[in-house]
Design a protein with these regions (language model features):
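A conserved active-site cap/scaffold subdomain adjacent to cofactor or substrate pockets
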Residues: 69, 75-142
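Short coil/turn segments at beta-strand junctions that form active-site/ligand-binding loops
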Residues: 32, 106, 153-157
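Accessory, non-catalytic peripheral segments of nucleic-acid enzymes
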Residues: 111-246
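Short, surface-exposed amphipathic charged segments that create phosphate/polyanion-binding patches used
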Residues: 12-20, 103, 201-211
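His/Asp/Glu-rich metal-coordinating catalytic cores
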Residues: 1-86, 90-95, 99-101
């Protein structure tokens, strides 16, 4: 396609597209099945930036199907009383920012109308699973719950577990052990630890142990709460004889 509208006549079907065409210049015969191809981000109205597509300016232009490219996930919306618009997305996700089913849209013309069907195509799918670990007292218990949560995900897919919630500072989730135990369940496994420590300073006010003194000093420091939690977590691992995760 050039910058302006380019038309391809296939008898019953007319296809039009351009890299930056003027919507006002689009001319489509009402008696034909009209498919328009554009690349950009849809906006409702007003001014937009580069790769911006105005829905309002494409209404009532005899469009039956507006094929859009730019977003990497399938989406569809009503254009007007006659037409619909679809982002087909990408054929396969390329990372955990492109989760979910990927594929293409199959168009069929029947009785001067166009029918569209999303066809899943990717052999492997990216999944991101948030999971609240609050209340799990042991790694085996948490592992069992995670296996149940992800039981419907095929082993050929890619999975990222995002652990959330508050955990006891004495027994935080062992990310390395979970990674080792669950790695064979998927083609690729990533675990992101977004948990926070459930610390009540009153629990350590009268604790005369090295641990108590360490936690009191960290909580009294000028570090922000996130950094305090990171330091406490590393310190407690070291006190237990484990390798701190810095």
């Amino acid at each position: 396609f050039g910058q302006d509208w380019t038309y391809f006549d296939f008898g019953e079907v007319m296809i039009a597209g351009g890299t930056a065409p003027d919507p006002a210049a689009l001319s489509l015969p009402p008696e034909r099945v009209n498919v328009v191809l554009l690349h950009g981000q849809v906006r409702g109205g007003g001014k937009g930036g580069e790769y911006s597509i105005s829905f309002s300016k494409l209404k009532n232009k005899n469009i039956d199907y507006l094929a859009l490219g730019h977003l990497h996930s399938y989406r569809e919306a009503t254009l007007d009383a006659r037409g619909i618009a679809c982002y087909s997305g990408c054929l396969m996700g390329r990372g955990f920012d492109e989760c979910g089913r990927k594929g293409y849209v199959l168009l069929e013309t029947v009785n001067s109308r166009v029918n569209h069907t999303f066809v899943p195509f990717a052999s492997r799918v990216f999944h991101e699973i948030p999971f609240d670990v609050s209340g799990y007292a042991s790694c085996p218990e948490l592992e069992s719950a995670l296996r149940k949560e992800t039981g419907n995900i095929p082993k050929t897919d890619f999975c990222r577990l995002v652990l959330k919630g508050q955990v006891d500072p004495e027994c935080p989730p062992d990310i390395r052990q979970l990674q080792t135990d669950l790695a064979g369940s998927f083609a690729l496994l990533r675990i992101r630890d977004e948990t926070t420590l459930r610390i009540d300073p009153r629990d350590y006010e009268n604790d005369i142990s090295l641990k108590g003194e360490f936690i009191r000093r960290v909580l009294a420091s000028e570090q922000d709460s996130a950094e305090q939690e990171r330091i406490i977590a590393c310190g407690l691992r070291a006190l237990r004889g484990e390798e701190p995760e810095i």
